[in-house]
C-alpha cells in the first residue's frame, strides 16, 4: 500500500522516534490527550531523539494539525507496539486535569483529520465500539476503521 500524509497538516517536524515501516495496514485511529493546551509545534517538540515516544499527528489548542511521524511509519504512542503498527496516533491538546477536555477547535480538527484518514485509506466507516475486549477482538472489514484509546494499552 502507498501511504500518504494528510493535506490538513500545517506544520511538520519529524521525530526520529518510530519503528520504520508498518507491518500491518492502517485500520485503527488512536486519539490521545496530550494533557496541556499545547500548540501543534509544541506537540512535535515533545518527541526529540531519546524520548521514547512519538505520534503520527498532533492537534494544537487552536486546531492546527502537525505531522510528527509519517503515516508510513509506526509511531511510539499507545504503549502497544501491536496497536501502533495498525493505528494512526493523534495527540490532542487538552486540559491538564480530569476530564482532560478538548476545546471545540481541537475537536473539529480531530473529526476532520479522522475523516481524511479514513478517505485516504479507503475506509467508509469509523467505528467506536466502546469496549476494550470487543474492540481489540474485532476484525475490521476492508471498508472499516476502528477507534481505540490509549488507556486500553497503558501500563
Language model region names:
Residues 1-84:
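N-terminal catalytic cores of peptidoglycan-degrading enzymes
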Residues 1-12, 18-23, 96-155:
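Basic/polar, cationic surfaces and motifs that engage anionic cell-wall
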Residues 59-64, 87-89, 119-124:
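Short C-terminal domain-edge/linker segments immediately following a structured domain
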Residues 35, 71, 81-99, 115-119, ...:
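Cell-envelope and extracellular/periplasmic
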Residues 28, 87-89, 146-148:
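Structural preference for beta-strand elements that scaffold enzyme active sites
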Amino acid at each position: 500500500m502507498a501511504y500518504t500524509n494528510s493535506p490538513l497538516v500545517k506544520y511538520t517536524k519529524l521525530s526520529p522516534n518510530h519503528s520504520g515501516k508498518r507491518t500491518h495496514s492502517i485500520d485503527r485511529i488512536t486519539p490521545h490527550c496530550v494533557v496541556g493546551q499545547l500548540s501543534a509545534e509544541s506537540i512535535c517538540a515533545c518527541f526529540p531523539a531519546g524520548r521514547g515516544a512519538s505520534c503520527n499527528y498532533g492537534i494544537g489548542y487552536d486546531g492546527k494539525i502537525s505531522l510528527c511521524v509519517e503515516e508510513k511509519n509506526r509511531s511510539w504512542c499507545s504503549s502497544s507496539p501491536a496497536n501502533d503498527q495498525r493505528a494512526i496516533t493523534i495527540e490532542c491538546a487538552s486540559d491538564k486535569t480530569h476530564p482532560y477536555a478538548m476545546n471545540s477547535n481541537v475537536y473539529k480538527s480531530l473529526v476532520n483529520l479522522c475523516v481524511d484518514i479514513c478517505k485516504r485509506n479507503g475506509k467508509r466507516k469509523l467505528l467506536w465500539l466502546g469496549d476494550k475486549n470487543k474492540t481489540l477482538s474485532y476484525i475490521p472489514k476492508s471498508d472499516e476503521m476502528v477507534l481505540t484509546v490509549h488507556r486500553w494499552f497503558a501500563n
